Amino acid sequence: MHEMSIAMSVVEAVVDKAREEGGGKITGIDLVVGRLAGVEVESLKFCFGAAARGTLAEGAELVIEEPEGRGRCEACGAEFPVTSFYAKCSACGQFRVKIESGRELAVRSFTIE
């Protein structure tokens, strides 16, 4: 389960930044996890609680935005939603689709007291 390592990395990064800023307890963390990122969001939420235990992030509210996958056909230029990396163009039927978004995995912001 790589969600635990992701949760641990998020906690470490946010706690380190909070300390740099001279802040106290972290009360909220906003993440962006694209639907094509290969992350089980519910597992990540569960793992976050364990990873944050005993840190400045313990008890912080975790808010996760899940942007949809978007692709652009390299044959005809059409843009459309995709649910996998092996997408067929909805306009011309070609399989030459470049994934434009949906793979995001980032801390958008966090709140400290």
UniProtKB/Swiss-Prot annotation:
One of its GO terms (biological process) is protein maturation. Gene3D superfamilies: 3.30.2320.80. It holds the Pfam family HypA. Signal peptide: none annotated. PROSITE patterns: HYPA (PS01249). Zn(2+) binds at residues 73, 76, 89, 92. GO terms for molecular function: nickel cation binding; zinc ion binding. InterPro entries: Hydgase_Ni_incorp_HypA/HybF_CS (IPR020538), HypA/HybF (IPR000688). Ni(2+) binds at residue 2. Coiled coil: none annotated. The keyword Zinc applies. Keywords: Metal-binding, Nickel, Zinc. Belongs to the HypA/HybF family. HAMAP family: HypA_HybF. Involved in the maturation of [NiFe] hydrogenases. Required for nickel insertion into the metal center of the hydrogenase. PANTHER family: HYDROGENASE MATURATION FACTOR HYPA. This is Hydrogenase maturation factor HypA.
